[in-house]
């Protein structure tokens, strides 16, 4: 009887606890973010304010006499830069709708930077010019879709005109001129990039790193460079420079760790039989196997060295396969039923010389079949085109460079960290612009190619008046790069634009650095076609979208003073 009563009491308590929890849940607040909705002219006006403020901050960097921008950082010293995309990325507004406009301009700058690597400032000021005129036209009753159609027709016409006037470049001097312009007139940077391209070719990888001196330097690594050094310093053959140097070596490439002494002995016998040095590339060499290699090197005088395979996962596999193709060997992998104890001479690669330091390995003049190497390069190029990941593209580009030529490193020097950082931004822009110029050719610089293309739009036929206004919006926008460059140099921009449009020489422009009118191509003031084409197309695309916007939905900021509702009583606490 007592047990029965205790059971009932227990069930009653459980029921009461359940009721308390249900009551508690009914008191919970659902804190969904409230939205603010802006319509029509108000929405576009606020977006335009964000676009204008961001563009005004970016445009001061344009041209040879553009100014720098100082950006506060959450950690470390403030960043000093003259790079448009860096300035754009750093700007965030408190007003949410204003921020939407700014974010869309950042999108333009990033898209232009991703495709062409330069021209972000040009893209930003073009976006502001097109969107400003578009907003005025829509507010005065124009049809937004017809305006958009007119803008699109005008851009297509300008791009066709620019392509017809582009000139391909090939000489080192022309490459240096493009680099100099993008580096804000610093001739040394332009020449450094031209030398790097001459050394590693147009497809070669050119990287930028911090230098250790006050001067800018170029270091070129020919052949394949692996970012792995010797496993043990006992492999060193040249005590003076602390490197292991192997001439005409055999190269064994193994995918896994080497732990078996028998496997090591088999490989050493092959090298001894041929009286040639040996390089072992594997995931790792474990202690007993490593000791065997070192003893044979020290006591038997066999020139041998072991390095770890660079990279991780699929990248490591692909890198080893590249090395095998370059040296004419095979990757020994258990997946194909191969092992080290059954290795024969045909599986080993070779090259003219290998130099191994504690940090890296350089393989010169691999013995691989030229046709096989070219096929491998084509395969990697296809992978680059198909890839959507920036990281994957970068890794594939590195692999291609290692196979096809070499790697050039631009070491940027300076008196302080801030100076080096600012110079690196300019060198990156210059390098990207140079690659774009080699790819699609050049046009007269200083904004004049766009300015003169605006003349051609007078003849463009349109279906109605609103489309004609869309064409005129682009015509006016194309004048802004020259206007901005002149204004930043302390000259009245409208006067410069007017004077250039009065005459008919398509190469005449305003040299803002010297303050005179010159033949831009002869003066070496040139722009890559790819850069200005991408800037215009991206700017027009996003501006058109913003012009046709009728509603903007943003989250309302949370009220920091709002106190959340208290939960109900906790179940199971009655005694």
From Swiss-Prot:
Molecular-function GO term, any one: ATP binding
Induction: By heat shock.
Stored SUPFAM superfamilies: GroEL apical domain-like, GroEL equatorial domain-like, GroEL-intermediate domain like
InterPro entries the UniProt entry points to: Chaperonin_Cpn60_CS, Cpn60/GroEL, Cpn60/GroEL/TCP-1, GroEL-like_apical_dom_sf, GROEL-like_equatorial_sf, TCP-1-like_intermed_sf
GO terms under biological process: protein refolding
Transit peptide: 1-32
The protein's name in its UniProt record: Chaperonin CPN60-1, mitochondrial
Protein's organism: Cucurbita maxima (Pumpkin)
Biological classification of the source: Eukaryota, Viridiplantae, Streptophyta, Embryophyta, Tracheophyta
């Amino acid at each position: 009887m007592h047990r029965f009563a205790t059971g009932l009491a227990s069930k009653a308590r459980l029921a009461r606890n359940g009721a308390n929890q249900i009551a508690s849940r009914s008191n919970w607040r659902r804190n969904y973010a409230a939205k603010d909705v802006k319509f029509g002219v108000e929405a576009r006006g606020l977006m335009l304010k964000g676009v204008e403020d961001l563009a005004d901050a970016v445009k001061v960097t344009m041209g040879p006499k553009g100014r720098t921008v100082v950006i506060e950082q959450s950690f470390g010293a403030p960043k000093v830069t003259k790079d448009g995309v860096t300035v754009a990325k750093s700007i965030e507004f408190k007003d949410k709708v204003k921020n939407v406009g700014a974010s869309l301009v950042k999108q333009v700058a990033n898209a232009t930077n991703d495709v062409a690597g330069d021209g972000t400032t040009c893209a930003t000021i073009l976006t502001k010019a097109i969107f400003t005129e578009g907003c005025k036209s829509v507010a005065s009753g124009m049809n937004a879709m017809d305006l958009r159609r007119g803008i699109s027709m005008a851009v297509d016409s300008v791009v066709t005109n620019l392509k017809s006037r582009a000139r391909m470049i090939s000489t080192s001097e022309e490459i240096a001129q493009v680099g100099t312009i993008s580096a804000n007139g610093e001739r040394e940077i332009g020449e450094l990039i031209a030398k790097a391209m001459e050394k590693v070719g147009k497809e070669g990888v050119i990287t930028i790193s911090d230098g250790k001196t006050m001067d800018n330097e170029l270091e070129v690594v020919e052949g394949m460079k692996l970012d792995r050094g010797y496993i043990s310093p006992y492999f060193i053959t040249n005590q003076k420079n602390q490197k292991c140097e192997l001439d005409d070596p055999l190269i064994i490439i193994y995918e896994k760790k080497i732990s078996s002494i028998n496997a090591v002995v088999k490989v050493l016998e092959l090298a001894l039989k041929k009286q040639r040095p040996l390089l072992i590339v594997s995931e790792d060499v474990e202690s007993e196997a490593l000791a065997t290699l070192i003893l044979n090197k020290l006591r038997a005088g066999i020139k041998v060295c072991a390095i770890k395979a660079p990279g991780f996962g699929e990248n490591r596999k692909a890198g080893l396969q590249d090395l095998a193709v370059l040296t004419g060997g095979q990757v020994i992998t258990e997946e194909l039923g191969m092992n080290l104890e059954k290795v024969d001479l045909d599986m080993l690669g070779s090259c003219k010389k290998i130099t191994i330091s504690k940090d890296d390995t350089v393989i010169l003049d691999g013995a691989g079949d030229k046709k096989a190497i070219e096929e491998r390069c084509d395969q990697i190029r296809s992978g680059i085109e198909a890839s959507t990941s920036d990281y994957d593209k970068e890794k594939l580009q590195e692999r291609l460079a290692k196979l096809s030529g070499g790697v050039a490193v631009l070491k940027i020097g300076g008196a302080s960290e801030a100076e080096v950082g600012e110079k690196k931004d300019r060198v990156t822009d210059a390098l990207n612009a140079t690659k774009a110029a080699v790819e699609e050719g050049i046009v007269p610089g200083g904004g004049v190619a766009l300015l003169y293309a605006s003349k051609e739009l007078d003849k463009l036929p349109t279906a109605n008046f609103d489309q004609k206004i869309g064409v005129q919006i682009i015509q006016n926008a194309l004048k802004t790069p020259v206007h901005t460059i002149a204004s930043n140099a302390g000259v009245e921009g409208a006067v410069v634009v007017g004077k250039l449009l009065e005459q008919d020489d398509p190469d005449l422009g305003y040299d803002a650095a010297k303050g005179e009118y010159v033949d831009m191509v002869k003066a070496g003031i040139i722009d890559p076609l790819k850069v200005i084409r991408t800037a215009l197309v991206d700017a027009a695309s996003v501006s058109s979208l913003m012009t046709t916007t009728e509603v903007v939905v943003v989250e309302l900021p949370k009220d920091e003073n709002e106190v959340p509702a208290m939960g109900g009583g906790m179940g199971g606490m009655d005694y």
